[in-house]
Regions:
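Histidine/acidic residue-rich metal-binding segments in metalloenzymes
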Residues: 1-82
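His/Asp/Glu-enriched, well-ordered alpha-helical/loop segment
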Residues: 4-9, 81-82, 87-164
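Short glycine/proline- and charge-enriched loop/turn segments
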Residues: 48-56, 93-101, 173-176
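Short, well-ordered beta-strand elements within core beta-sheets of diverse protein domains
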Residues: 11-14, 56-62, 116-121, 141-142, ...
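Residue-level signal for inorganic ion chemistry
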Residues: 12, 35, 85, 115, ...
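Short, conserved clusters of charged catalytic residues that mark active-site
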Residues: 21, 65, 132, 145, ...
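C-terminal cap of metal-dependent C-N hydrolases
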Residues: 97-100, 152-214
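A short acidic, glycine-rich active-site loop
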Residues: 55-66, 102-106, 179-185
Length: 216
């Protein structure tokens, strides 16, 4: 893929990077953006219990040493984004063994708490979360002039985050099976604003969708 990208001078976005080995070829390219996911930065293959299919995802979770290399690449900028890859499913689809179980992890509601705990434990400046989870994704989407920053002329898309709040009592997404243990990730979103309009506050959601087409 890297050779094709370089040959044609095209732009390439690598999604859900789980293997740090792949970075050796991507580092040589220009016009390449890379994302990874909270589960690749949290779990390690050595720690997954036998038959625990709630950890199955694609690409798979890899070894502890690989996880640390992903963190190093994220901090130095070789990986620019952290995205949820939220992929929930009914519990029945996770039954059976790893060969037949659904491959996906539900994490959308917990993503900020997970990453907040990681940067705190690793001594990373919290402002890096803004880069990885807001500013850089906005730039990739071609919206750096409108999204991803608190500045004049930008949409007032805001999250009111309380790092000292108790973990959520329940998950809001429909299919709640997840390998994460919510009680291990304190903090909660108190409110969310979209273009200045409050769409969420302490478990209550806006009654009508307020999304808009950003680019034709």
């Amino acid at each position: 893929m890297t050779q094709l990208q370089q040959a044609f001078g095209s732009y390439m976005h690598i999604v859900h990077l789980s293997s740090a080995d792949a970075l050796r070829s991507y580092r040589r390219g220009h016009g390449i953006a890379i994302e990874t996911c909270p589960h690749y930065l949290t779990f390690a293959a050595e720690d997954i219990p036998y038959g625990a299919t709630e950890f199955k995802c694609a690409p798979p979770i890899r070894e502890r040493e690989n996880r640390e290399r992903l963190w190093a690449a994220l901090e130095e900028g070789a990986i620019q984004m952290v995205v949820s890859d939220h992929s929930p499913c009914p519990s029945a689809m996770k039954s059976g063994d790893f060969s037949s179980a659904w491959g996906g992890i539900a994490s959308l509601q917990l993503g900020l708490a997970i990453m907040w705990k990681h940067v705190h434990d690793r001594g990373i400046a919290p402002k890096r979360l803004i880069e990885w989870m807001s500013a850089n994704p906005a730039g990739l989407a071609g919206l750096p002039y409108r999204k991803g920053a608190i500045a004049p002329g930008f949409d007032a898309d805001l999250v009111i985050w309380n790092p000292n709040a108790a973990p959520p009592a329940e998950l809001h997404h429909r299919h709640k099976l997840t390998p994460y243990q919510p009680h291990q990730y304190p903090g909660a979103v108190e409110a969310t604003f979209l273009r200045g309009q409050k769409i969420y506050e302490r478990g209550s959601f806006a009654s009508a969708p307020l999304g808009a087409i950003l680019k034709p």
